[in-house]
């Protein structure tokens, strides 16, 4: 397992977004969104990388376009990166996606990108679908744990079964029809995270519905039915996959 010494707060301040949707819980007794500030001693507000501004096309615009500061949007409108060139914008978008999946290493993330190119369809869609097949992500999406890091911990400590066999590799890619379950002796520990009486009666119906997972919260198990489509995958932030792909091109 890769060492991750930096805190979760640092990931929030680096990206400037509520990346896992749990930002308010990381800063106690605080009413402000501290992740909107840059890391370091001299904190500043994260600035928007791009603004829209109507401009007339000319030689100066063509020159700015060549330098990577402009992206054509329409006949009379261009997107201007006031604060950072195009590369920095692409890098930050890639980092957002990589850090969301519990800081997947750069080498591993690039390998996913290479595999995604070999499949039919859009590279960005293939990349996300492959990441969503990871065992730790399936456990997190099913609602058995509170975070992806907790899901990864369960897998690494051999508390997760795939088709009734122990699987301790968090990056294991689940196949259609696979059954993922938690060891019975660990189920009671996970039950303490929820109001279990309500969860048993509703069988988890108050959690986010995922059509590609058949979940049984009474036994803490689920069946991976099929690879989800992009409209079935939820992110707590806006994501521009075109920038992620252009970063590697």
Swiss-Prot record:
Residue intervals of the S4 RNA-binding domain: 133-193
Tell me which PROSITE patterns the record gives. RIBOSOMAL_S4, S4
InterPro entries found in the cross-reference section? Ribosomal_uS4, Ribosomal_uS4_CS, Ribosomal_uS4_N, S4_RNA-bd, S4_RNA-bd_sf
Query: What is the similarity comment for this entry?
Result: Belongs to the universal ribosomal protein uS4 family.
Entry annotated with the keyword Nucleotide-binding: no
Where's it mainly located?
mitochondrion
Q: Output this protein's name.
A: Small ribosomal subunit protein uS4m
Alphabetized, the UniProt keywords read: Mitochondrion, Ribonucleoprotein, Ribosomal protein, RNA-binding, rRNA-binding
Keyword Magnesium: yes or no? Answer: no
Q: What SMART domains does the record point to?
A: Ribosomal_S4, S4
Location in or out of the cell: Mitochondrion
Name the cystine pairs.
none
The source organism is: Reclinomonas americana
What would you give as a GO molecular function for this chain, any one?
A: rRNA binding
Q: Look up the record and report any one GO term of the cellular component aspect.
A: small ribosomal subunit
One Pfam family from the UniProt entry?
Ribosomal_S4
GO BP field: ribosomal small subunit biogenesis
């Amino acid at each position: 397992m890769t060492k991750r010494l930096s805190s979760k707060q640092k990931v929030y301040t680096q990206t400037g977004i509520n990346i896992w949707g749990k930002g308010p819980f990381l800063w106690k007794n605080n009413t402000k969104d501290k992740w909107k500030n840059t890391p370091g001693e001299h904190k500043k507000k994260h600035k928007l990388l791009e603004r829209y501004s109507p401009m007339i096309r000319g030689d100066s615009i063509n020159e700015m376009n060549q330098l990577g500061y402009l992206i054509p949007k329409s006949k009379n409108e261009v997107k201007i990166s006031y604060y950072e060139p195009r590369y920095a914008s692409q890098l930050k978008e890639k980092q957002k996606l990589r850090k969301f999946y519990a800081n997947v290493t750069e080498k591993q993330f690039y390998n996913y990108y290479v595999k995604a190119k070999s499949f039919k369809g859009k590279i960005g869609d293939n990349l996300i679908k492959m990441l969503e097949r990871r065992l730790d992500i399936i456990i997190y999406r099913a609602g058995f744990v509170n975070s992806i890091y907790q899901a990864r911990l369960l897998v690494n400590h051999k508390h997760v079964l795939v088709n009734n066999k122990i699987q301790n590799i968090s990056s294991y890619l689940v196949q259609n029809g696979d059954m993922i379950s938690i060891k019975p002796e660990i189920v009671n520990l996970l039950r303490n995270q929820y109001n279990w009486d309500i969860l048993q009666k509703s069988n988890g119906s108050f959690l986010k519905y995922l059509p590609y997972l058949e979940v049984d919260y009474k036994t803490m198990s689920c069946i991976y039915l099929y690879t989800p489509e992009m409209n079935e995958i939820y992110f707590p932030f806006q994501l521009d996959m075109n920038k992620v792909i252009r970063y590697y091109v």
